[in-house]
């Protein structure tokens, strides 16, 4: 083997190793935390119609510090930042776009445990670019930094992230956020775009599922960078994304939502968007649809009508818990009741659904316990694979009015075309037959000629 052949072999070997690494699946374990200090509902009463100025008939909030069911969890990823490897536990959040931690001098009403000290990292650099983020559970602001981040053990990458000078963040036992939404004002600062830039994946694809992991005994969830083999199976389904003004969330078009058990199924048709948010531990419904849910829960034995026409919501046992059913694209996704309800400290089950004033549905961690969900920023689609307790029922695709018109028009043109072809073919055959027919008197003419 000559020298050039050796160099070629070495080059091919390095290329194949690099290609296999880039295309391989990277696993990041996720760890659950109990969500405290967030209002939960027990013995809910709501007037109909809802009057926010009427304290007597409004919503009653209580603090359920002991609540700890499957649905009542958020999930953390462990990372290290800086030359000294300062450790942080960050909430995985597909509802925002940037990674941020608190500065060591961070002020505000926050419960951040670990804070970043730029002075102890020789590689930290303040970019001077300001950021301001708002969440349902708080807000933060500060400046973007550039430093090494280790989210894969023993591998560091130079990345941008936010360092908060002020944080009003009410979720306990965490140090910040890993934002994984599709886009932001500057793509260079989006975490998932930085993953691709550093060659960790050959496309803007990652997936999330919340269940016990064999490779990490204390983890109860995992994030995969790259496309997992689940999504090549026949049970997996794809749904196109929809885009919202100003900012792109991971969202699809919701066509209906309802509750069901073995004997009863109640649902309503909607035309709105459904946002998938790993940073939310509940199912959030628009207010006008939440009232429908309150009515339906009484039909399942999970509530009663009050004298003021409000509703008192409770579930006495696990047997009475209805399933939540979401329909988007042409698929019904069923979340079992044990994931859609909390068990309160007083022994009653509380629906994990809450309401907000806007017209958008937000589905949180209950969904990811039963569906392995893939976020594909390259093809602008979401993919879902049912886990142990998840059910996907696929129906026929709903066609738009324009598509129906085209199909009907095309069908008419096709039928008319076939009819014309048959007509002219028959006509041509008849004309040909008429030319080949011998007249009855032709023998008499010839006889007279030779006579």
Per-region residue spans from a language model:
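Extracytoplasmic, non-cytosolic globular domains
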Residues: 273-302, 306-310
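Signature of the N-terminal lobe/flap region of pepsin-like aspartyl proteases
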Residues: 61-63, 69-167, 173, 296, ...
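Cleavable N-terminal signal peptides of Sec/SRP-targeted secreted and luminal proteins
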Residues: 4-24
């Amino acid at each position: 083997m000559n020298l050039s052949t050796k160099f070629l072999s070495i080059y091919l070997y390095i290329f194949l190793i690099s290609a296999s690494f880039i295309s391989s699946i990277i696993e990041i374990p996720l760890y659950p935390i109990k969500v405290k200090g967030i209002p939960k509902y027990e013995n809910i009463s709501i007037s109909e119609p809802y009057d926010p100025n009427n304290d007597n008939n409004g919503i009653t909030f209580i603090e359920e510090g002991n609540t700890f069911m499957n649905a009542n969890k958020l999930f953390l990823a462990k990372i290290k930042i800086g030359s000294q490897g300062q450790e942080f536990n960050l909430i995985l959040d597909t509802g925002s776009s940037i990674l941020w931690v608190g500065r060591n001098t961070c002020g505000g009403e926050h419960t951040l445990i670990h804070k970043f000290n730029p002075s102890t990292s020789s590689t930290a650099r303040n970019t001077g670019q300001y950021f301001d983020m708002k969440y349902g559970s708080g807000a933060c602001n500060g400046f973007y930094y550039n430093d090494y981040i280790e989210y894969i053990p023993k591998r560091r990458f130079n990345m941008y992230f936010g360092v908060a000078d002020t944080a009003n963040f009410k979720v306990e036992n965490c140090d910040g956020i890993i934002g994984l939404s599709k886009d932001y004002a500057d793509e260079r600062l989006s975490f998932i775009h930085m993953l691709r830039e550093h060659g960790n994946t050959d496309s803007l694809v990652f997936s999330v599922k919340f269940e016990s992991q064999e490779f990490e005994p204390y983890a109860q969830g995992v994030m995969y960078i790259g496309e997992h083999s689940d999504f090549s199976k026949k049970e997996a389904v794809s749904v196109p994304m929809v885009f919202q003004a100003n900012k792109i969330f991971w969202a699809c078009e919701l066509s209906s939502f309802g509750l069901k058990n073995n004997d009863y199924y109640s649902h309503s048709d909607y035309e709105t968007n459904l946002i998938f948010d790993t940073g939310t531990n509940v199912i959030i419904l628009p207010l006008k649809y939440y009232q429908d849910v309150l009515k339906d829960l009484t039909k399942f034995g999970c509530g009663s009508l009050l004298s003021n026409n409000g509703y008192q919501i409770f579930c006495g046992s696990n047997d009475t818990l209805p399933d939540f059913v979401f329909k988007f694209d042409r698929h019904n996704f069923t979340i079992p009741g044990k994931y859609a309800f909390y068990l309160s400290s007083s022994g009653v089950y509380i629906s994990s659904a809450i309401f907000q004033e806007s017209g958008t549905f937000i589905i949180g961690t209950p969904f990811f316990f039963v569906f392995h969900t893939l976020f594909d920023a390259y093809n602008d689609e979401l993919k879902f694979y049912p886990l142990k307790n998840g059910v996907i029922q696929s129906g026929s695709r709903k066609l738009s009015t324009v598509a129906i018109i085209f199909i009907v028009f095309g069908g008419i043109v096709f039928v008319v075309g076939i009819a014309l072809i048959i007509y002219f073919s028959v006509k041509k055959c008849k004309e040909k037959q008429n030319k080949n027919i011998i007249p009855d008197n032709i023998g008499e003419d010839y006889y007279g000629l030779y006579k």
